């Protein structure tokens, strides 16, 4: 039962985080951030937020620094928008799955070109 609730809270947090990043945060380091997923623990105490950033590694690190600096504000906004007893602690991670998928797709295209 709690797993279903954690999934619902994660989906709602994903929507709210996207809205917060787009409308509320004015930090130029956090301009090109996309929230790809949110995993909330069963006790709703922690949330792992997976993001992608448009840009190179330097911009990714700057974005992560900006997010960690704004973590308190983001958490308070989540607390205002989602009615929970305690707002989950946020941990930001880069979602490498999109880059990994693009790399595999490129390798498959190279194999197809070599086979022709």
From Swiss-Prot:
The gene is rbfA. This is Ribosome-binding factor A. The keyword Amino-acid biosynthesis does not apply. NCBIfam families: rbfA (TIGR00082). HAMAP family: RbfA (MF_00003). InterPro entries: KH_dom-like_a/b (IPR015946), RbfA (IPR000238), RbfA_dom_sf (IPR023799), Ribosome-bd_factorA_CS (IPR020053). One of its GO terms (biological process) is maturation of SSU-rRNA. One of several proteins that assist in the late maturation steps of the functional core of the 30S ribosomal subunit. Associates with free 30S ribosomal subunits (but not with 30S subunits that are part of 70S ribosomes or polysomes). Required for efficient processing of 16S rRNA. May interact with the 5'-terminal helix region of 16S rRNA. Its main location: cytoplasm. It holds the Pfam family RBFA. Belongs to the RbfA family. The keyword Transferase does not apply. It is found in: Cytoplasm. Keywords: Cytoplasm, Ribosome biogenesis. One of its GO terms (cellular component) is cytosol. Monomer. Binds 30S ribosomal subunits, but not 50S ribosomal subunits or 70S ribosomes. GO terms for molecular function: ribosomal small subunit binding.
């Amino acid at each position: 039962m709690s797993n279903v609730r954690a999934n619902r809270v994660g989906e709602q947090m994903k929507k709210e985080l996207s809205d917060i990043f787009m409308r509320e945060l004015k930090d130029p380091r956090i301009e090109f951030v996309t929230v790809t997923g949110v995993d909330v623990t069963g006790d709703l105490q922690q949330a792992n937020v997976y993001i992608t950033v448009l840009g190179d590694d330097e911009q990714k690190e700057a974005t992560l620094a900006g997010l960690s600096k704004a973590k308190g504000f983001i958490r308070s906004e989540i607390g205002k928008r989602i009615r929970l007893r305690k707002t989950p602690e946020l941990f930001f991670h880069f979602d490498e799955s999109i880059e990994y998928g693009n790399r595999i797709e490129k390798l498959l295209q190279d194999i197809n070109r070599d086979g022709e």
